[in-house]
Amino acid sequence: MELLAPLTGIVALLFAFYLTNKINRSDPGNPRMQEIAVAIHEGAMAFLMREYRTLIFFVLGMTALIVVAGFMTRGAESMQPATAIAYVAGTLCSIGAGYIGMQVATRANVRTANAARHSSNAALDIAFSGGSVMGMAVVGLGLLGLGIINYVFKNPSIVNGFALGASSIALFARVGGGIYTKAADVGADLVGKVEAGIPEDDPRNPAVIADNVGDNVGDVAGMGADLFESYVGSIISGIALAAALNIPNGTLVPLMIAAIGIVSSILGAFFVKTGEGANAQKALNTGTMVASILAIVGTFLATRLLPAHFTAGSMSYTSTGVFAATIAGLIAGVLIGRITEYYTSGDYEPVKEIAKASQTGTATNIIEGLSTGMLSTVLPILVIVIAIIASYRFAGLYGIAMAAVGMLSTTGTTVAVDAYGPIADNAGGIAEMAELDPKVRKITDALDSVGNTTAAIGKGFAIGSAALTALALFSAYTAAARITAIDLTDPKVVGGLFIGGMLPFLFAALTMKAVGRAAFQMIEEVRRQFKSIPGLMEGKARPDYARCVAISTGAAIKEMIVPGLLAVLVPLAVGLIPGLGKEALGGLLAGATVTGFLMAVMMANAGGAWDNAKKYIEGGQYGGKGSPAHAAAVNGDTVGDPFKDTSGPAMNILIKLMTIVSLVFAPLFMQL
């Protein structure tokens, strides 16, 4: 039974291989389209390889630290040098998923554009297949690596190292990718749209290739690494708590639910079909719904592996209660996605209010957008609170972990739908730059519009899953560190709470400033090219795309280091400093989880709302493109870009990474 998980991971990778071959056999279009696609592909892969080369030093340092700490706590059962093997495996699997997804996404984009010359259904098929490769790579490598590590070592504490490896890569991928894409996006929008008055994806814009590369490094590789981390983190939290609470077969159930989720996602992918002129959103929703229903049925069967009645700690629970806790997580994920859609879609009042406020200038646009983001935290918090209380009543701490597993059981489908968006967006950019028939751009714009909605829902889902996963990992940490309660009368704990509450703000400041510095360089370069290259604005000369790509790449690699180290070093420092220790660290994790979740929701939703308010005006409202309201909305969207694509999403990984660092090094903290 234990081998079923890694075998299912292999099935996912085989399905990804089948989809890759299908995409590669598709027509990549005319020479001009292929030339543009090659530039995007080479820029994306160059960034990814440079990022991975930079991370080698971090991985080697962390590996050495784990080995040293393992020998220092050799007498402690849970801290062993072998944890370093699991850590390296986690980093390699995360890197592998990102590499596979990026390779295929940057090939699917041009083929989607070419397919749109024939039919919208063909374009949807290619774009979703490209997204599905990323989805299957995430769940396939995640479950294969995790399943093998669990089977070989049969020690949940060693398995924790796999989650640490996944988290380490995820944070750098999210931050680095977010800085890259937003530096390019801000430069392309402010100088191209506002100052030069040229449309989006216009080939005269020097930052246009960097902008399209950024869609891939941020929204494909970065997003995939984020959900890869949540996926393995939720499973590992379930395994760790089951082992700590001595639940019979409890370590097996999370792996089985994940395996069932992979099969459900594969079957659901075959239902993403639509007729000509039909709604692509409906097709994606159908595939997601089929996968979710199959996962629910499979989860019920998987929980039958548990005894009908069992004891965890001093409490008695049932297998039916575990099933109910898992479903509570799944429902919470769906609800948070829908709440996110309400606050970020142009179909609803919040975005329309921001568009309306744009009529009186940038200031009122910013004020309305910020207030919308803050207001959007209320319902997700209530949903998470209800899910936590319900899952705890159903199955205790193990129930909270299983709620996170349930929410992430169909990660294969979630990533596929999310990664579909940037592929469709790139296809539209290629169609514009290659000067294809306007009908092609109309089809790709329709697919991209759906992609914007799915991306917003995906961000909400990622944030919700991060909160539950972080809480489950926090529960595993308290069990490993033998902390029975967080005592709010203890000054050390209160100090930890305040430090933890501050960290997401510091992290957001560092990442926002990084985007600002990188965008400044990009804006200066784009302005320079418009002024110094004769005939560029008339379309008679070609801009220096490579220079803008180099600026984004260099800035992203340089600026991702400090925020990444912050998430690892702060919990280690608090846990090791005399007078603070494991209790203060518990307070820090609690404080960071609360404020980090709130910041993530606020920033992601405010940014998404600003973006769609701009698109709402571009659709013809309040004067349409070129109007004063549109200029204000573009400025608001530019502020929102690092909110929704850099700082907000990276906040998810911050709270999970700090918790998993604490969990892995808990034996070391206990011996001080």
Swiss-Prot record:
Major subcellular location class: membrane
Positions annotated to bind Mg(2+) 1: D185, D189
Bilayer disposition of the protein: Multi-pass membrane protein
Chain ranges passing through the membrane: 1-21, 55-75, 82-102, 133-153, 158-178, 227-247, 252-272, 283-303, 317-337, 370-390, 397-417, 461-481, 492-512, 560-580, 584-604, 650-670
Subcellular location: Cell membrane
Site feature Determinant of potassium dependence, where: A455
Protein's UniProt keywords contain Protease: no
GO biological process: sodium ion transport
Record-annotated site: Important for ion transport: R174, D219, D226, D645, K656
Regulation: Requires K(+) for maximal activity.
Translocase as UniProt keyword: yes
Binding site for Mg(2+) 2: N212, D215, D425
Cofactor(s) required, per the database record: Mg(2+)
Residues that, per the record, bind Ca(2+): D611, D637, D641
Lineage: superkingdom: Bacteria
Catalytic activity, as annotated: Na(+)(in) + diphosphate + H2O = Na(+)(out) + 2 phosphate + H(+)
Gene Ontology molecular function: diphosphate hydrolysis-driven proton transmembrane transporter activity; inorganic diphosphate phosphatase activity; magnesium ion binding; potassium ion binding
Keyword set, alphabetical order: Calcium, Cell membrane, Ion transport, Magnesium, Membrane, Metal-binding, Potassium, Sodium, Sodium transport, Translocase, Transmembrane, Transmembrane helix, Transport
Binding residues for substrate: K182, K644
Its job: Sodium pump that utilizes the energy of pyrophosphate hydrolysis as the driving force for Na(+) movement across the membrane.
PANTHER family hit by this protein: K(+)-INSENSITIVE PYROPHOSPHATE-ENERGIZED PROTON PUMP
Subunit note: Homodimer.
Membership in a protein family: Belongs to the H(+)-translocating pyrophosphatase (TC 3.A.10) family. K(+)-stimulated subfamily.
Descriptive protein name: Putative K(+)-stimulated pyrophosphate-energized sodium pump 1
Highest classification ranks of the organism: Bacteria, Bacillati, Bacillota, Clostridia, Moorellales
